[in-house]
From Swiss-Prot:
It comes from Koribacter versatilis (strain Ellin345). L-citrulline binds at Y86, S91, N122, R126, S175, S184, E260, Y272. GO terms for biological process: argininosuccinate metabolic process; L-arginine biosynthetic process; urea cycle. Homotetramer. It catalyses: L-citrulline + L-aspartate + ATP = 2-(N(omega)-L-arginino)succinate + AMP + diphosphate + H(+). HAMAP family: Arg_succ_synth_type1. One of its GO terms (cellular component) is cytoplasm. This is Argininosuccinate synthase. Keywords: Amino-acid biosynthesis, Arginine biosynthesis, ATP-binding, Cytoplasm, Ligase, Nucleotide-binding. It holds the Pfam family Arginosuc_synth. Pathway: Amino-acid biosynthesis; L-arginine biosynthesis; L-arginine from L-ornithine and carbamoyl phosphate: step 2/3. The keyword DNA damage does not apply.
């Protein structure tokens, strides 16, 4: 009986040539698993291409709702951003795809799983850590670490030799990844960090020059830290993110150019477009500023850094990530209300925020006397706060006097 290998298949250059390569080198049946996380491809065309390339079976998993509610929304609630800029679009999409791939492998009686990630990137860790956490009995095959192909140009030659049609060419050599949260762009002119992205690099958002010459306002409503409405209209998760992506993209929101530190120790340069996610993150931050006490807010910011690092490194299926999620969930109970954002040519400004759970009290915050806050109380507070500083100064001054004598 021939071995069955389940491949995470996208229809791109790498996975398109992996199907015939696996069959040639492992004498196996290849089951192509297509995880739909909102990449916008013609799924029927991707399925047809997998069959044409040699897949014995193609299984499509609609992961869009799961991706949003179980991965993207927790990231927004956490406030997770990697190295100040990256909203983890690709990092968040890999765990649900790998999970679905393992489920298919076990259901189909496969002995191995495979992916198209290079040996230099983060995705190999994200997929393989998930495989080991969920089904350690499955063999892992990583063609990029085995075959003799050394570059994307070599992959193009292999595709041409095997009659495989791909969208990439030597002139269009960018590596792109798209889902409901973002589009990433790597390779080509971007490999030189001193090169500005070409106008043709960006595929989703308008440039600031092309964006409207007027401000557009959008109000995002939250319940329990989760976005639930736009401009007062309740929406299901998929409809909500699609509308925010549309609004953000036409206003040039969410373009990011980043030199980042990969988990494997390599610095890389990528350009990302995250229109709707950027709006969600900005609105959620403003609502937390209203609703969280100082100590919780500040500590949560530390948690967000660690959470982002874990997810970027591919360590989704870990006890620590689950524990951090539990902490974040406890902070989100009172994150309810609405934030109005004003969008203009790539800029996001806050135009208003309101919450029934707000800790902000105008009567206390104002410069007016009274309202339950006696300004004289500040004197004792400041003296106690300054006690260590006064003590240190007295000791240091006493030491200086002895030296001068």
């Amino acid at each position: 009986m021939r071995e069955k290998i389940v491949l995470a298949y996208s229809g791109g250059l790498d996975t398109s040539i992996i199907i015939p390569w696996l069959k040639e080198n492992y004498s196996c049946d290849v089951i192509a698993m297509v995880g739909d996380v909102g990449q916008g491809d013609d799924i029927d065309a991707v399925v047809a291409k997998a069959h044409k390339t040699g897949a014995s079976k193609v299984i499509v998993k609609d992961l869009r709702e799961e991706f949003l509610t179980q991965y993207v929304y927790p990231a927004i609630s956490t406030g997770a951003v990697y190295e100040h800029k990256y909203l983890l679009g690709t990092s968040l999409a890999r765990p649900p795809i790998a999970k679905a791939q393992v489920e298919v492998a076990l259901a189909e009686g496969a002995t191995a799983v495979s992916h198209g990630c290079t040996g230099k990137g983060n995705d190999q860790v994200r997929f393989e850590h998930a495989f080991q956490a969920l089904a350690p009995e499955l063999k892992i095959i990583a063609p990029w670490r085995e075959w003799t192909l050394k570059s994307r140009e070599d992959c193009l030659d292999y595709a041409e030799a095997h009659g495989i049609s791909v969208a990439q060419s030597r002139e269009k050599i960018h590596s792109r990844d798209r889902n409901l949260l973002h589009v990433s762009h790597e390779g080509g002119e971007l490999e030189d960090p001193n090169n500005a992205p070409l106008d043709t690099t960006w595929t989703w958002t308008k440039s600031p020059q092309e964006a409207p010459d007027r401000v557009e306002e959008v109000t995002i409503g939250f319940e329990g830290g989760v976005p639930v409405s736009i401009n007062g209209m309740k929406l299901e998760p998929l409809a909500l993110i699609e509308l925010l992506n549309e609004i953000g993209a036409r206003n040039a929101i969410g373009r990011i150019d980043l030199v980042e530190n990969r988990f494997v120790g390599i610095k890389s340069r990528g350009c990302y477009e995250t229109p709707g996610g950027s709006l969600l993150l900005a609105a959620h931050r403003e609502l937390e500023a209203l609703c969280l006490d100082r100590d919780t807010l500040h500590y949560k910011q530390e948690v967000a850094l660690k959470w982002a690092e874990l997810v970027y490194f591919g360590l989704w299926f870990t006890p620590l990530r689950e524990s951090l999620d539990a902490f974040v969930a406890s902070t989100q109970k009172n994150i309810a209300g609405a934030v109005k954002l004003a969008l203009y040519k790539g800029n996001i400004a806050v135009a208003g925020r309101t919450s029934p759970k707000s800790l902000y009290r105008p009567d206390i915050a104002s410069f007016t006397m009274g309202a339950g806050y006696d300004q004289k109380d500040a004197e004792g507070f400041i003296r106690i706060l300054g006690l260590p500083a006064r003590s240190r100064a007295l000791i240091e001054n006493a030491g200086k006097e002895k030296v001068s004598k």
